[in-house]
UniProtKB/Swiss-Prot annotation:
Binds 1 Fe(2+) ion. This is Peptide deformylase. The lineage of its organism: Bacteria, Pseudomonadati, Pseudomonadota, Alphaproteobacteria, Rickettsiales. Its EC number is 3.5.1.88. InterPro entries: Peptide_deformylase, Peptide_deformylase_sf. The keyword rRNA-binding does not apply. Belongs to the polypeptide deformylase family. GO terms for biological process: translation. Fe cation binds at residues 102, 144, 148. One of its GO terms (molecular function) is metal ion binding. Its cofactor is Fe(2+). It catalyses: N-terminal N-formyl-L-methionyl-[peptide] + H2O = N-terminal L-methionyl-[peptide] + formate. The active site is at residue 145. Removes the formyl group from the N-terminal Met of newly synthesized proteins. Requires at least a dipeptide for an efficient rate of reaction. N-terminal L-methionine is a prerequisite for activity but the enzyme has broad specificity at other positions.
Length: 179
């Protein structure tokens, strides 16, 4: 299957809340496979369906970074996942600031403050309800991709001035590459 095109900001699809997936069928499974292929081809860690123009509550991710020492027992910090209709049920009070990037905002990265740990409920490709306790980059990626499903770009977590500068840079990038 050919890789899918990634939607680049500014684009109204990236600021639109995605709708719930009502059933998992072969079409959804094929979409998920194409999303993984697209994510790997773009060398990303995660990809939300809205980033390929599909306004459904699905994202994929593959975090194979080194485990962070000192993470609490029972929390995952690596793994390959497809999350359908995800919902964060618990966020830690403890927060951490790390640099993030995004396939939909190329050639930029910004320091973003996010909760360090979380619990998320979601459906897998077998339509089974799953619960995951996540930490480290896995927790960060879940929050980043879930923001996409809610129509929020990660740069929205910046100050207004930094957000405006990031959007101007994104607009310039998009104009340059659309020629």
């Amino acid at each position: 299957m050919p890789k899918l095109s990634i939607v680049v900001a500014p684009d109204e699809r990236l600021t639109t809340r995605a709708s719930e997936v009502t059933g998992i069928n072969d079409k959804i499974k094929e979409l998920v496979n194409d999303m993984f292929e697209t994510m790997y081809n773009a060398e990303g860690l995660g990809l939300a369906a809205v980033q390929i123009g599909v306004l459904k509550r699905i994202f994929v991710m593959d975090i194979q970074l080194e485990d962070i020492k000192g993470e609490p027992v029972g929390y995952e910090s690596t793994g390959k996942f497809c999350m359908i209709n995800p919902e964060i049920t618990e966020l830690s009070d403890e927060q951490v600031i790390l640099k993030e990037g995004c396939l939909s905002i190329p050639e930029q990265s910004h320091e973003i403050r996010r909760p360090k740990y979380l619990t998320v409920k979601y459906k897998d490709l077998n339509n089974k309800e799953q619960t995951l306790k996540a930490s480290g980059w896995l927790a960060r990626c879940i929050q980043h991709e879930l923001d996409h499903l809610n129509g929020i770009l990660y740069i929205r977590h910046l100050s207004k001035l930094k957000y405006d500068m990031a959007m101007k840079k994104a607009e310039k990038f998009k104009r340059h590459y659309e020629r």
